């Protein structure tokens, strides 16, 4: 996509119905999730991180309902810089009824492994990355989305044509 923000916006547009659905975020976290929720008229459910800036798995699972479509996990997290515990993430992917997005914009600064190698295990998992941070290439505006073939096919149907410029390609 034209930056990770476009990829995140496409996820809202594909999986959420405006003025009906909600998504879950874990503050403190990347502020663009809230901006995109507002732009797309999607309710934002905030479940704060707990001790050591980790997800409150029980609360997240408890708070989802039929209208909860996406869970955003920014790991490594912006602004706290920590990665979420892998077993907590795995539990959330398995117990969350919608799409789980792991935003790995800062993965190149982490000692933890990316979730890319586990995409085939979880059909509800989307991993996003960027070249803006570790590679210092923010100006080329390249956001990367990894997911099942089915999810990528749907996202490709609604993305604008020619959204990635020639230099970036």
What spans do the regions from the language model cover?
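Conserved acidic residues
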Residues: 21, 69, 125
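Short beta-strands and strand-loop turn motifs
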Residues: 44-48, 70-76, 100-103
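Active-site pre-lysine segment of PLP-dependent enzymes
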Residues: 38, 55-66, 79-134
